[in-house]
Amino acid sequence: MDTRLAREQLNLLAQEGGRLGYNTVQSVREYVEAASIINVALVDLGEGATQTIAKLSNIFGMEQMYGVRDSMLKIGSTVNHLSQNCTAAKPFIVEFAQRMAGIGSTAKMTIPEIMAFAATLDAHGQKVEMSATALQRTIMELFKKPAEMAQKVGLETNTFIETLNKSTTQGVMMFLEALGRLGEDKALAVLSPLFQDLGL
């Protein structure tokens, strides 16, 4: 294994892999390889980030598609790409994705889609916990009352529902774009019932 980490650190990573449920030599090896690369390439993610990335790859089904190593590296590459192309911080992107994992996977969003939202929100100076909660509530409300929410922002109901059912991300973007066209006062009137306890 080509790595810059000392053997003791590799052993610790192997133990981490075991705690995450990797119980074969191959899966532990792949976790150690990916984690060692991520820890060097994305050092500013901080402690525990590789475990979070591994959990995300499992929750979103990437591990089943690409294997332990490649799924983790794909997520790490997404984080690196976004942070290099805007002012978003890597820890914000990963924490946001972690907070969005439950509803994001249920709504069939991809990790790159969620991380793109994270990068945009962080670049605009939003706090991670508040941002994730706001997006979660928006998504839940759109699925709970799609016709009502479409009408509030002037969207054609059937078109919006069809778009939302096809792609959560496309539906959310359609809603947000329509919201932006309303102007600040009307947009706040639409969103305030969802976010009043968040101080937004």
Language-model features and meaning:
Residues 1-94, 103-112, 124-132, 143-152, ...:
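A short, structural motif
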Residues 118-122:
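Extracytoplasmic, non-cytosolic globular domains
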Residues 131, 190-193:
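Acidic/histidine metal-binding catalytic segments
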Residues 194-200:
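Short, intrinsically disordered, charge-balanced linker/junction segments flanking boundaries
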